[in-house]
Amino acid sequence: MTHRTLRVFALIVAAVVFAGTGIAVAGGATARAGLGKSTEIAKKWQGDAVLTSISSLEVQPDGTARTWLYMFYSPASKKYNIVTVKGTSFEGLEVNSGMSLPIVGEFLDSDRAVAEARKNGMKGSSISVGLNMGGIGKDARLYWSVNGGFEKGDVSVTLDGKTGTFVKKDVMPGF
């Protein structure tokens, strides 16, 4: 996992913690499960809102999670909003920074992304995931970053976000 991806996860965690929303709720769902309602909430916030990231810091081995964070960007206002989904609860929060490249088209759901990452060497007991665009211009692609954990020796795997094709893996040096 790149340092940029780690910073993005840290930003999302900080947004949730400082919003006082915490991270824990019963029940698990895949990343795609809350997308429709999250998008509705974001469109009410800003009509031109586009999805730029989906992530969770507490993912189960089957690729489901109790909490998902959907980041949206408004090109007109240049503002960001994170919709936190916990079970059947949806809460939007405007934040100061985030990603602006929109996720366009279909993407692999989190259950398949975690399964593909495991096939390609993902290792660890504290799974977190993030789906976002990477690259510049016509080289921009959609990626799943599937992190096995942050302990020394844990392995994170990056996959093509649409197909699940292996891109790379990184071994965590430990902190």
Language model regions located:
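Long, terminal "pre-/pro-" and other extracytoplasmic accessory regions
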Residues: T2-L11, V16-F175
